[in-house]
A protein has these predicted regions:
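Structural detector of well-ordered beta-strand residues that form the stable sheet scaffold
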Residues: 106-107, 128
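Extended, subdomain-level signal for the structured scaffold at the beginning of enzyme domains
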Residues: 1-106, 114-119
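A conserved active-site-flanking secondary-structure segment within enzyme catalytic domains
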Residues: 123-136
Length: 136
């Protein structure tokens, strides 16, 4: 019997994500789990995507990303790590909006909420983030 794994996609863009946010997503969803052998199937199918598949600067590290935003069309859950110093590309914002409209679960870590706001996904909704990053 084959069971479909839950598809999780982490979204990156050059200078957009914090390294700790990416590490958390990788550890939670991308790392092998000891219990997977007990359950008989892996828990998640984990993918990282970006607008232009290429090396993406995350903190002081270049992350080699092989998948484009088309990966979002197959996602069950989309992860937005904490936001870095650059705004997300419009192509990513549009892809997030399409994923949301399809009913995909979208999760942000910390200041990743700003990316959701820039995509218009928080319009009229309460949201939280770190208070020390608020400027208005």
């Amino acid at each position: 019997m084959t069971t479909q794994r839950h598809r999780v996609v982490c979204v990156l863009a050059d200078g957009m994500a914090t390294s700790i946010g990416v590490a958390i997503a990788n550890d939670l969803f991308g790392a092998p789990r000891q219990a997977e052998g007990l359950l008989g199937v892996p828990w998640y199918q984990y993918t990282v995507c970006t607008a232009d598949p290429s090396p993406v600067r995350v903190g002081a590290v270049d992350v080699h990303v092989r998948h484009g935003v088309s990966a979002l069309s197959r996602a069950d859950t989309v992860i937005i790590p904490g936001r870095g110093t650059r705004p997300p590309p419009q192509e990513l914002l549009a892809a997030l909006t399409r994923a949301y409209q399809r009913g995909t679960r979208i999760v942000s870590f910390c200041t990743g909420a700003y990316v959701l706001a820039e995509a218009g996904l928080l319009d009229g909704r309460p949201a939280t983030t770190l208070s020390d990053v608020l400027t208005n």
